[in-house]
Amino acid sequence: MKQLLRTASILLSLTIAISSVAFGQKTYAIALGGGAAIPVGKLADTQKTGYSALAALAIGVADMPLGVRFDGVYNNLPGAAPNGTTTNTDLRVTGALGNLIFAFPGTSAKPYVIVGGGIYNAKADVSGAKAKNYFGFNAGLGATFGVGPLAIFLESRYHSVSRKAADGGVFQFVPITLGLMF
């Protein structure tokens, strides 16, 4: 995990350095948000709607619709006791993600499409369970609403995390996030 964080930090630094040289007018934004994390597919059979949190660094160029965003995500999906059982297990999913964003033109409200991928770390809240890293992707829609020097954003993304069949197979969830960019 330390190697992964070190590599992600180096890549982020290189991306910022390269974009600084390549483009004159850069725009940066830090985003913080939270909301609901909704399990879908097979995951909805064992987990209930939980909560999500997001911290992000968005990098773009003025007057260009394409940008990049690096996200740190945290999702907690409470266990839903299957029929006939009395036990349930929470699932915690964190991630370090890189995304491309295409923002449509607008004045104070700008819709956007976001797509990306990265490393997800999942751990069931069970004694002896170990956290494991998996690759996954995400795609979604959102909108930013300018409020003076700040922006409010609302987005929904579909996350698909690829696990080995022995670990339970692929799972999906959809966070709906409301946040602030500054």
Where do the protein language model's features map onto the residues?
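Generic short beta-strand segments
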Residues: 34-38, 74-76, 159
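Transmembrane beta-strand segments of Gram-negative outer membrane beta-barrel proteins
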Residues: 24-36
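Cleavable N-terminal export/targeting peptides
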Residues: 1-27
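A short acidic/glycine-rich loop-to-helix N-cap element
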Residues: 44-46, 163-169
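Gram-negative (and chloroplast) outer-membrane scaffold detector with strong preference
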Residues: 53-127, 134-137, 145-148, 174-182
